[in-house]
Amino acid sequence: MAEKLGRSLQGRPVVNNNLKLFKACGALLLANKTKRLLFLLRDNDTHSNTWGLVGGKVELQETVIQALHREIFEEVGVLPTINKTIPLELFRSDDGNFEYHTFVCVIDNEFIPELSDEHKGYCWCDVDSFPKPLHPGLWSSLNNEDIQQKLNTVKDVLEIA
């Protein structure tokens, strides 16, 4: 069962000890039935024509999970029922002013997204076969051996269940 959410205010930095800490989050939606991941093709000025995750800024007064759900809805037009939310990676910039939380969100089935104006395409891909070119940050993450192992473990556990 999908849930419709209202749109919210623009992203704002979280203020922490007089430093601006920018938090963002992203979701690799994993369809349990097909074991495939959703990627979105970016259509904005920053890294346009690269494949990326559903995601964006964590707004003031939002938890990372609340932001994750809001971003999923805003970018694909629906919040599918998420059976499991599995932390995949927490990236922190060297200066400590930016962090990006990446999750695998397990859903039942693939769906056709209603894309926002931030994206111009989508694809569902196998865990070991990503579209090209990937967003540079996502490329770094998905080519990390530990993260590849985590993704394969999630896929294997779902196949056993």
Language-model region placement:
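Functional cleft and adjacent loop/helix regions within the main domain
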Residues: 54, 60, 104-106, 112, ...
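Residues embedded in well-ordered beta-strands
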Residues: 26-28, 36-38, 102-104
